């Protein structure tokens, strides 16, 4: 309508023998300024300064929105934040970055270069997997070296391994290889999922990740090495859809990377871009409620009772917390309290962060990442996900960032992170971590001294632990789960909480609890999806496009 009126106005001016070109330029200038002012009046609130929330804020900044990011913590990063004790920096959450091009694309969208903000280093091997029989399997990006490793340890499974990797590639190509694949598109309509079911059926997506690996290789150790990746996103390898088998190809193609300064350095860089865009971050600010008016989201209410009005709200809080707590006083049709309780939630995490002194020259065979397998795989996973009990044995994921990043620890010292998958708090008679935390930490220490870090107790300097109880309190994660809803077949795509709320216009979701799911690539993709869904008619790019089209049409 604005363009039609402008054309009519200019034709009238031409009839009056006024300078047509000059009038056009004046009107275009007025049009741009007016539209820019409208854009700046559109306010978006992002609840949560995790990777998903920060990425969404960056994208909305480009689209012309006034953005306010609020977070209850005193630092950015959410699960990707860090703490410092005695000169040791402990990364609390993700320790590796896969698919770094997603970060590069995000920065490019903002007209910037990621490498100007963050120093990302490739790591190889990705991780060393140890087994009780003494076997050490080095997973790495170089295809020929990886095949040599498989041939050395599992010679009868080399051909099966090759077939498995081809299968992994097909899954990746189908689900996540580009912006037009299901992992990077909105799944708002049931039809979006139904139309890909034939392809899912062809790839036997109904099989678990472990069952799919077992189809190709026979050695139980190699089956474990090719199927444990769902644990990185809180899933049961014996239940999670085989589509997650794509991770093996993803690692081979893009490698595994580490950010110098820890993952929190990425979050800080994202925050810097947001501020450069003229937008705001408010830490130590807890949102108690997302408020609605006439059925539409209209802002948030803070814990101090103050309200912040907004045109749209993007929640980076766990989707269970968003619908179960932040919208507690509002009637919901789909994600009711009852439905949330029926969901299967990801496992809990026990993480022991510890510092050592005079160890930089010790434990030469302990690199950046080590997976220490206990005597059981299926049985331990069953105890965690099905029985909900704290097993006597354990498997550990050990991170030693100081071998690659001197800033992580004092001189000659080391910083470590030992993660043990444990049950979440949703079981009857769930673990009382107030009583069990220290005894369990001691068991973790004993396991490390026996299997990986002999003499550890003689070098300990700092200690910090997190349990599912901390995840519940610090991150407001339902049942203290580490990764929101478990990424099972019928808790994925359309079946997962949507990126745009089904119940409340103006509410959008990013992060692990929405589509496409947990993991750094997943939460970055969720922000990309939300940016596609949010109207961009007042963005800077759209303003210029309208002006250019207007000039051509006159």
Q: Predicted regions: what is each one?
A:
Residues 41-173:
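N-terminal glycine-rich phosphate/pyrophosphate-binding loop and immediately adjacent elements
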Residues 132-239:
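Rossmann-like flavin
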Residues 219-233, 391-399, 454-516:
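A glycine-rich dinucleotide-binding beta-alpha-beta segment and adjacent secondary-structure elements
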Residues 246-297:
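Helical element adjacent to the flavin cofactor pocket in flavoenzyme catalytic cores
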Residues 286-410, 551:
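Mid-domain catalytic core of redox enzymes
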Residues 292, 536-554:
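Active-site-proximal substrate-binding core of FAD-dependent oxidoreductases
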Residues 359-471:
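C-terminal segments that line or cap access tunnels to active or ligand-binding sites in enzymes
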Residues 514-534:
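A conserved FAD-binding loop/helix module that cradles the flavin
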């Amino acid at each position: 309508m604005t363009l039609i009126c402008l054309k009519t106005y200019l034709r009238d001016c031409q009839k009056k023998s006024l300078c047509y070109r000059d009038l056009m330029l004046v009107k275009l200038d007025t049009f741009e300024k007016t539209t820019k002012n409208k854009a700046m009046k559109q306010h978006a609130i992002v609840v949560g300064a995790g990777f998903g929330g920060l990425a969404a804020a960056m994208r909305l900044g480009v689209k012309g929105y006034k953005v306010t990011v609020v977070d209850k913590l005193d630092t950015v990063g959410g699960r990707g934040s860090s703490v410092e004790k005695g000169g040791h920096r402990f990364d609390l959450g993700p320790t590796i970055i896969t698919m770094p091009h997603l970060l590069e694309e995000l920065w490019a969208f903002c007209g910037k270069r990621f490498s100007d903000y963050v120093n990302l280093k490739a790591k190889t091997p990705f991780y060393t997997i140890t087994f009780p029989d003494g076997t050490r399997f080095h997973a790495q990006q170089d295809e020929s070296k990886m095949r040599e490793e498989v041939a050395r340890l599992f010679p009868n499974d080399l051909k099966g391994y090759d077939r498995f990797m081809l299968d992994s590639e097909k899954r990746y190509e189908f689900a996540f290889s580009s912006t037009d694949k299901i992992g990077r598109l909105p799944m708002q309509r049931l039809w979006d999922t139904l139309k890909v079911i034939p392809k899912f059926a062809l790839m036997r997506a109904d099989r678990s990740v472990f069952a799919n690996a077992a189809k190709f290789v026979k050695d139980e150790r190699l089956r474990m090495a090719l199927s444990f990746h769902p644990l990185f996103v809180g899933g049961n390898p014996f239940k999670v859809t085989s589509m997650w088998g794509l991770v093996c190809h993803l690692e081979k193609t893009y490698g595994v990377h580490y950010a110098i300064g820890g993952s929190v350095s990425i979050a800080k860089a994202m925050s810097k871009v947001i501020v450069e865009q003229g937008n705001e971050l408010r830490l130590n600010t807890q949102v108690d409620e997302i408020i609605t008016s006439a059925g539409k989201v209209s802002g948030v209410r803070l814990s101090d009772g103050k309200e912040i009005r907004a045109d749209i709200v993007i929640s980076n809080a766990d989707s269970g917390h968003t619908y179960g707590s932040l919208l507690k006083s509002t009637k919901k049709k789909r994600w009711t309290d009852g439905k949330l309780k029926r969901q299967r939630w990801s496992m809990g995490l026990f993480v022991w962060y510890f510092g050592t002194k005079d160890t930089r020259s010790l434990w030469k065979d302990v690199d950046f990442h080590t997976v220490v397998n206990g005597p059981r795989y299926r049985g331990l996973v069953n105890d965690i996900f099905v029985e909900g009990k704290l097993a006597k044995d354990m498997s550990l994921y050990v991170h030693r960032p100081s071998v690659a990043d001197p800033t992580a620890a004092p001189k000659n010292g080391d910083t470590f992170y030992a993660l043990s998958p444990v049950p979440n708090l949703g079981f009857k008679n769930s673990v009382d971590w107030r009583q069990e935390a220290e005894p369990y930490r001691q068991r973790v220490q004993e396991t490390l001294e026996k299997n990986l870090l002999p003499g550890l107790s003689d070098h300990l300097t700092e200690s910090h632990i997190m349990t599912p109880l901390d995840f519940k309190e610090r991150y407001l994660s339902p049942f203290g789960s580490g990764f929101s809803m478990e990424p099972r077949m019928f808790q994925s795509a359309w079946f997962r909480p949507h990126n745009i709320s089904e119940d409340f216009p103006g509410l959008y979701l990013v992060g692990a609890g929405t589509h496409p799911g947990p993991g750094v690539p997943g939460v970055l993709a969720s922000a990309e999806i939300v940016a596609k869904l949010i109207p961009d008619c007042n963005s800077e790019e759209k303003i210029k496009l309208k002006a250019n089209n207007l000039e051509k049409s006159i």
